[in-house]
Amino acid sequence: MPQKRDFISIMDWSSEELINNLELALELKKKTREGQCPKELEGRSYGMIFHKDSLRTRVSCEVAIFQLGGHVLTMSEKDFQMGKRESVKDVAKVLSRYLDGILIRTFSHQVVLELAEHAEVPVCNLLTDFNHPCQLMADALTILEKFGRLENIKVCYLGDCNNVTNSWLNLASRIPLDLRIATSKETLPPEHLVKQVQDAGLSKLSIYHEAAEAVQDVQVLYTDVWASMGEKEKTKEREQLLFGFQINRDLLNLSSPDSLVMHCLPANREREITAEVMDGPRSIVYDQAENRLHAQKAILAQLERWRN
C-alpha cells in the first residue's frame, strides 16, 4: 500500500530495509556505469534546501536525481528564511504542493523533524548537527564493496564525536558491527546513543582513550574533522584534546594488514589525518565520496517506490 516514508535517521529504517537498500545501491551503480540507470524519478520534481555550504552533498544529490530522471530545484537560506520569515510548518505544506520530495541540509535536527512531520512528501536528511545518515549509507556501501560484507566488520572511529559518529552508533543499532570509538574523555558520544547500541544487542561497542589500543586488528580506520562547520572557535581546543588520535603511518601499521582508511571529507591534512596516509594506497576516501552518489540514488529510489 502506498505510504509516505522519510529518511531522517538510520533508525527510521529496519535492518532488512537498510541491507536491501545497500543492495539496490550496488545495482544502481552497476547499471549507471553500463549507461542503463533506471529512471525511477521520471516526471518527479525534488527540492533541496541548503543552510550549510556543500560540495559532495549538493553535487551528488543533483546528479543522482538527474540520473534517475528527475528534476531538481536547489534553494538556500537566501531564498527564504524557514522558521523566521515563514514557519517550518508553512514551508512544509507549501513545498508539498509543488514538489515530490524534499531534501535538506541544515543545522537544527529539530527543524528537519518538524519539516517531515508536516510535509506530505518524503523528506530526506542530508545532514544536521545531530546526524548524517546519507553519509553512513555511502560508508556502509563502500565497506560492503571492499570487504564483501558489512556484518561484524571491525571499524575504529577516531577523533571528535560528532554527527557522523552518531550515525555510526545508529548503524550499529541496526547491523552487527565491531565498532570502536577512540576519542578523548572530553569528546565522548551521547550516552543515550551508546545505550541504544547496548540495548539493541547486535554490535560490540568499545570506547577507548588510547588510539594505539583501539586500532589493534581493525579493518577500517575512520576519521572526520575535529571541528565541524560553525565550530571554528573550537579548533585549537580540539587540537589539544585530539592530537593523539591522528591517523598516521605509525597508527595504521598497528591495525590489520588489510585495513583501509576512510574520511567523509573535507579533510584537514596533517591534523586528523596525514597527507601520507590520505593519499596512500590504503586510503579509499575518493571511492567513499563517489558512493555518496550511488547511495543517495538508492535512498531516493526507495522513498519513491514506497510512495507508489
Where are these predicted regions, by residue range?
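Positively charged, low-complexity intrinsically disordered leader regions
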Residues: 1-59, 63
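Phosphate/diphosphate ligand-binding glycine-rich loop within oxidoreductases
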Residues: 35, 39-144, 269
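Phosphate-coordination loops involved in phosphoryl transfer and adenosine-cofactor binding
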Residues: 41-46, 151-153, 258
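Glycine-rich phosphate/diphosphate-binding loop of Rossmann-like nucleotide-binding domains
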Residues: 51-64, 145-223
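Short, structured coil segments at secondary-structure junctions
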Residues: 68, 98, 118-119, 175, ...
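Rossmann-like adenosine-cofactor binding region
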Residues: 198-276
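Adenosine-phosphate binding glycine-rich loop
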Residues: 258-259, 265-308
